[in-house]
């Protein structure tokens, strides 16, 4: 079960996912491609993306950090769509993180891959 936290400025969310870093990175690219997002890899752990969430085009930083028990996923709103409210920013950030988490659950847990690899 992922652990969630929202940072005080409301423009970032972090969650620890019970998957290795490689799977989380793959999920990020799959979600971005599925949503037709433009993105660039800035380093081995960070992707900057322009993505439409709920019809609002915003700029995000998506970062992964390997932890002792899983991988920390961090989604930060770098540039919100003009006029997007603070609650809209938080919903968009949560939607991006949820999409990545859901992809991992669907592809690894539901298909049994994750369970087989961890036996």
Labelled PLM ranges:
Residues 1-119:
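Ser/Thr-rich, low-complexity intrinsically disordered terminal regions
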């Amino acid at each position: 079960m992922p652990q969630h936290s929202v940072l005080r400025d409301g423009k970032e969310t972090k969650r620890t996912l019970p998957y290795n870093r490689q799977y989380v990175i793959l999920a990020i690219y799959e979600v971005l491609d599925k949503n037709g997002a433009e993105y660039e890899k800035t380093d081995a752990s960070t992707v900057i993306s322009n993505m439409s969430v709920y019809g609002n085009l915003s700029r995000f930083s998506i970062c992964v950090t390997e932890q002792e028990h899983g991988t920390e996923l961090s989604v930060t709103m770098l540039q919100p769509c003009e006029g997007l409210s603070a609650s809209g920013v938080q919903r968009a950030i949560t939607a991006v993180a949820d999409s990545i988490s859901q992809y991992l659950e669907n592809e690894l847990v539901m298909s049994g891959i994750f369970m087989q690899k961890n036996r």
